[in-house]
Amino acid sequence: MASVKLFFIAILVVALSLNTSAAVLNPSSTAKPRFETKDRKLSAGALQSLAG
């Protein structure tokens, strides 16, 4: 029973270390944003419909 717990703890440690090493190799600050911001300008018709 103790060996099973040890085995699961070892798997958890390996998974955590792989996760942190992947985060170090691929920092989120340099990664592309999922949704790129676009310059959206309202047309005159849209402004009129917003104004009522």
Swiss-Prot record:
Protein's cellular compartments: Secreted
Keywords: Behavior, Hormone, Secreted, Signal
Protein name in the entry: Accessory gland-specific peptide 95EF
One of the GO BP terms on file: sexual reproduction
Induction details: By mating.
Domain of life: Eukaryota
Tissue: Main cells of the accessory glands of males.
Cleaved signal peptide residues: 1-22
Organism of this sequence: Drosophila melanogaster (Fruit fly)
Physiological role: This protein may be a precursor of secreted proteins and peptide hormones.
Coiled-coil stretches: none
Lineage of producing organism: Eukaryota, Metazoa, Ecdysozoa, Arthropoda, Hexapoda
A GO cellular-component term linked to this record: extracellular space
GO molecular function terms listed in the Swiss-Prot or TrEMBL record: hormone activity
